[in-house]
Amino acid sequence: MATSAIQQSAFAGQTALKQSNELVCKIGAVGGGRVSMRRTVKSAPTSIWYGPDRPKYLGPFSDQIPSYLTGEFPGDYGWDTAGLSADPETFAKNRELEVIHCRWAMLGALGCVFPEILSKNGVKFGEAVWFKAGSQIFSEGGLDYLGNPNLIHAQSILAIWACQVVLMGFVEGYRVGGGPLGEGLDPIYPGGAFDPLGLADDPDAFAELKVKEIKNGRLAMFSMFGFFVQAIVTGKGPIENLFDHLADPVANNAWAYATNFVPGK
């Protein structure tokens, strides 16, 4: 009888949790208008990447993990030598900044390599190397998107600068200022219209995707740093540097360039 009671209690708890997780959106009338809101339901992920038994930054050789790093959030490997996450408010702010920079870095890394890949496969560009492409706007013909003047044709660096400042500055200022458009939404994972494929509908799958995003984003940030260094040292794009390394790994590697690099030459 006791076993039956425990099973019934567990089943009831699972049913309540499922109903709670399924209630993601709530439509209500506010001032005669309709406002779509997403309610974030926090449940303990079953993934190996969360909780006290999650993988640590040095595996079994990791030192004492700070008590405030409990494995609640994605990407927590228990490493915080500088104590940057000790304050909860600072931790929340840094988490948001990291995810935003991860997403920018992933887009940036794709933008650095994709034009070179297309160029090497026959697509004509004015300049496919990422750090040289912008200078095409100063050429006589201006800058054509994908080398096609019928798509986006830019000739004024001032117009490009104004668009960047006005459009991106406005959006970023709105985000930082906490505009009413995002009220009731998670600032990092808003869902709703920002998740048209419904990737976050399954809580366990969503927890896994958060980990994948942060891991790939951190890798992308390191990649972008590497692309910057490559541009300064070799004057070539990442794909061309890769081909050079594959052709002659001994002469074209980080150690060889570091020992022979002379600034300004």
From Swiss-Prot:
Binding site for chlorophyll a 4: 216
Compartments it resides in: Plastid, Chloroplast thylakoid membrane
Co-factor binding comment: Binds at least 14 chlorophylls (8 Chl-a and 6 Chl-b) and carotenoids such as lutein and neoxanthin.
Binding residues annotated for chlorophyll b 5, in chain numbering: 164, 261
Main localization of the protein described in the UniProt heading: plastid
Distribution of this protein across tissues and organs: Present at high levels in leaves and cotyledons.
Residues where Phosphothreonine is found: 40
Binding-site residues, chlorophyll a 5: 212, 230
Name the UniProt record assigns to this protein: Chlorophyll a-b binding protein 151, chloroplastic
Source organism: Gossypium hirsutum (Upland cotton)
Lineage: Eukaryota, Viridiplantae, Streptophyta, Embryophyta, Tracheophyta
